[in-house]
Amino acid sequence: MGIALVFVTLALFLNLRVAFWVAAGLPFIFFGTLYFMTDSYTNMTLNEMTTFGFIMALGIVVDDAVVVGESVYATRKQYGDTLQNTIAGTHKVAIPTLFGVLTTVATFFALSNVSGGLGTLYSQFGTIVTLCLLLSVVESKLILPAHLAHLPTKTTPKKGIAGLWNKVQGKADAGLQWFNYRLYQPLLKVTVTYRYAAVLLFIALFVVVMSLPLTGAVRVSFFPSMQGDTVTANLSLYSDASFGQNERNLLLLEQNALEADRQLIAEKGAEGSGISSLQVTASGDQSGTITISLDESQPYSLDELSARWNALTGTLEGVKSLKIRSRREMVDGFKVELKSINEDTLIAANTAFQEVLEDIDGVYAIESSLTPGEAMMRFEITPQGRALGMDTQSLSQQLLKAFGGEIVQRYLRDKNEVKVRVRYPEEDRMNPSDVMNTQVRLDDGTVVPLSVVATVFQDVQQKQVVRIDGLRALTVSASVDSDIITSTELVNYLNESFVPQLEKQYQDLSLYFAGEAEQQAETQSSMQSVFILALLSIFALLAIPLKSYIQPLIIMTAIPFGIVGAIIGHWSNGLMLSLLSLNGILALSGVVVNDSLLLVSRFNALRREGMALENAVIEACTSRLRAVLLTSITTFVGLYPILGETSIQAQFLIPAAASLGYGILFATAITLLLIPALLLIYEDVAGIGARAKKSVLRVTG
């Protein structure tokens, strides 16, 4: 779909045969990239991320080919269909298009080096786009000109489908010319005339849009949960759970799931069942999983089934952990580590945290690593017991055999070994009082009550004690419904309204937000370093062809305004800003400077030819309008199919595609309006500096 949209866009505005050869370079680029994915080179596989890399590259890699193809065709049409003119047309735009590709390579290569598990995952599509871009340089600078060298520019009028398409192209070209002369040029002249006001207006727009995430108009979730294709219940029991409790809990969970399905079907006015498969798996005696898949025609959603199933289930006996989820979480959700030297402080803080979380909508499956202690009975031989000949070893063996049992016989039944164990009847070994009332045998065979030979102490012992940096520690965790509240919003809320009071009340308590918050801090730190490196690389690559340190900064103003476009795209599509969005924004940083580089390079060439300042700016913008619009539109339409995709796999890709697609559209307006204004402001400042320098020289001279 994306390839078709790109080709149609090219064919609308380029000569049909030029558009064909530009699009024909895509197979070379993609097959070449597949070759470098083999074991001998990058050792990568075709998966969701690498496929997304190809889709993202689809609109980007034709950008320089569009510029080269248009330049070659225009040069040959003006000066003749010769090989020399083909070379001249290629050479005219070779440097800006080459360095434009290299700036994009710099950002995608930086993206492939983001650290962390998720960074490693997303680095795959960064590597794919980098390979595609490098191969596009070979295709656009060597292969494409070779094809265009044999393309006649002077042809007779066509009939049939070709003639009809020529009329369509004529309409498209007329529309572009109307836009250029009736809308763009008048607006451009107003912008350069009132350039300082225009820059202030753009800055105001930047401030307003960047405030959207801060005000909550655009929600932020660094690691958003994605819709899954099943509902899963994961059950874990305490180690001292009674025999058969796991099986009983799984049976109850299964019944609740079926009841939730019946209720939802009735509420929707449907018939039958929405469940296509239900699989129950018991892992030993202390854990199990139930996985439910829904029929394609079910009248309710996975989230609705998950919520109703949770509501019907409530608290189960002996359960340590129960999570019923319909969404795939990229990392652990909410988690906070509590540490203190005082055990009572930890227990109180643990209770307070759980109570606060229970009152927050969208927070569920709250768990704590503070497990109930195990009841313990300790026996101490009395002086009378020692006098009667009882010792610790004899007492422990008798109690173990009485309550745990002793194997007295083994035999085979159907090739299976059967153990015969002798112990007290079940009704006599279920309660602590049964131990208190037991009888023990002395060495001479006399049977006496346990209380005669031993004192019994009852206590509670923790199953495990966790220490971090010498302090007792525990963890409170929870799952978060990001449609209601994200983990980022939850942490911010707790830091503002709860944590300060808790730390004031328990001064020996320290806490640390782990889980998603910890992963976010780690990934953000890596992305900041990578982003700075990418910006420095872009600056260096722009400074080389422009031979200036100021003009690269002017061009790079398109980057923050590209981010504005990305945020507007998220806002208009109801998307949350996330790590996936930031990956798209990082990639956007290299793409948005390409059109500005073309424009500034053309401006510099016109100035060297002696054209007046404002005339050079206007001529550079109008002459590059077609190429700028075409490269931006092809990038957007190449990504557009992802933006409309509803499949579960695409949910990981849409935020990055929205960042790049909408960012490049908005950056186009920046290229065509803000960059000319900034060029003239720079010339204004340079002129003031030159005049001031002359005045100083006259005074000192």
Predicted features along the sequence, with ranges:
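Extracytoplasmic/periplasmic membrane-proximal domains and adjacent transmembrane bundles
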Residues: M1, G69, I347, Q354-A534, ...
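Hydrophobic transmembrane alpha-helices and their membrane-interface caps
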Residues: A4, V8-L12, L16-Y73, A540-S623, ...
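Transmembrane alpha-helices and their membrane-interface boundaries in multi-pass membrane transporters
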Residues: D39, N47, L58-V72, A94-N113, ...
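Transmembrane helices with small-residue packing motifs
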Residues: D39-T45, S112-T120, A198, I203-A241, ...
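Helix-loop junctions and hydrophobic alpha-helical segments within the transmembrane domains
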Residues: G69, A74-L102, Y181, Q524, ...
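Signature of alpha-helical transmembrane segments and their immediate interfacial
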Residues: V93, A162-S221, T622, T700-G701
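Extracytoplasmic/periplasmic
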Residues: V220-T291, E343-M376
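Solvent-exposed, membrane-proximal periplasmic/extracellular interface segments of envelope transport
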Residues: Q245-E329, R386-G405
